[in-house]
Amino acid sequence: MSVYLLNIALIFIWAFFLLKYKPSKNKKKAFCAIACVQWVILSGLRGMNVGADTIGYRRSFYRIGLTSWHRIFADVSDYIGGAEIKDPGYALFVKIFQVFSTNYQVYLVFIALLFMIPMAIWIYRNSSMPCLSFIIFSTLFYSFYAVTGIR
């Protein structure tokens, strides 16, 4: 829990130095980039016992690694045909990722990048108060995001 509080404190500190005095587009961009990097580190390098579903997704990640491509494509095809198969697109996504890395921690960092970069860009473009946007995300929405967001 203390690491989340530290993250929020750092967001306030960066906002104070970058957004409070003589704000500019470049400072806003730097703030959003720094906050994004913080969240990628926090989310991507979390322990396996953080979050209710991290261990389950880890097991699923390695189980998918043992599943043949033929089975993955058959499941996707069956799902498109109307069969009730749980998350065939997620299995395909993980299998494609495993072409590049079979390390689950690398996968978590990749997922964090995939989620946080677009979010930071959106905040940069659409928020007049990026500090508040990141704080709201930090306090309200992060608990809903994990690998579940990709699934």
Predicted regions and their residues:
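Membrane-interface micro-motifs in multi-pass membrane enzymes
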Residues: 1-6, 108-109, 143-151
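Start-transfer (signal-anchor) and selected internal transmembrane alpha helices
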Residues: 1-39
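Structural signal for the C-terminal ends of transmembrane alpha-helices
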Residues: 13-25, 44-45, 117-127
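Transmembrane-helix signature of polytopic, membrane-embedded enzymes
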Residues: 26-29, 120-140
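Extracytoplasmic loop-helix module adjacent to an early transmembrane segment
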Residues: 29-36, 43-71
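Short hydrophobic/aromatic helix or loop-helix immediately within or flanking a transmembrane segment
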Residues: 55, 59-66, 70-102
